[in-house]
Amino acid sequence: MASSLLILSNSDSGLYDFRKEVLKALLEKGFRVAVSVPDTGYVDKIKALGCDYIPTSFERRGMNPVKDMKLMLFYRRLMKEYRPLAVLTYTIKPNIYGGLAARLTGTPYLVNVTGLGTTLENGGLLQKMIILMYRTALKKAGCVFFQNKGNRDFMVQKKCASGKVRVIPGSGVNLTEHRPEEYPEDGGQIRFVSVMRLMKDKGIEELLAAAQTVHEKHPETLFQILGAYEE
């Protein structure tokens, strides 16, 4: 399929919410777009755009050598079957195992580093292993995209991205579909809103402790959290 593109990601909701415009632009240019991502409820929306869906199952978090090897072999099989013009990967596991599969099959590929993840941020032996895997997986990438300069500088310093790199403007909200609205009346409350993933590594426990301390001294305060629960 010379005009097909293969998209690899770990989140159907993230792909639809933040990269929908990319998918639509590729489709409008005449490409056949196949998407490999676990189904958590957004696949029908992705298919409605005109994308082909490839059922995919893997754990977003954690490292299991056997399961991760199966994922890499699954990606390699997809690339041999679809023979895409190029592969675009998002998020850590698709970046690493999709990148390795692309190298093994000689498929051109582009990588989007959407974040470093707690493993790279925390250091230690596991960090060294991930860095080595990134170096191998990204070595032949046509381009490595980053969401911010900090991630780019870290990966370049660690020699994970030695070729063409770009910092993209961001993956923001489509303000045509999501129009700003007036903030609701607060009734005299002081409101704190945290937009975050509900994970220990992201500081949820510290936030809850701080909220309790502040609320005990200032009952007029209200703390709200917007985000997905992940652990």
Where are these regions (language model features)?
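Short donor-sugar binding/catalytic loops of nucleotide-sugar-dependent glycosyltransferases
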Residues: 10-14, 195-200, 214, 228-231
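Conserved donor-binding/catalytic core segment of Leloir-type glycosyltransferases
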Residues: 184-202, 207-212, 223-224
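Donor nucleotide-sugar binding/catalytic pocket of nucleotide-sugar-dependent glycosyltransferases
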Residues: 54, 135-180, 191
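Nucleotide-sugar donor phosphate/pyrophosphate-binding loop at the beta->alpha transition
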Residues: 17-18, 66, 70-73, 108-110, ...
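Glycosyltransferase donor-sugar binding loop
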Residues: 37-41, 195, 222-231
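Short His-centered aromatic/hydrophobic patch
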Residues: 89-95, 113
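Conserved nucleotide-sugar phosphate-binding/catalytic loop shared by glycosyltransferases and other
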Residues: 28-67
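N-terminal subdomain of nucleotide-sugar transferases
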Residues: 1-39, 51, 214-216
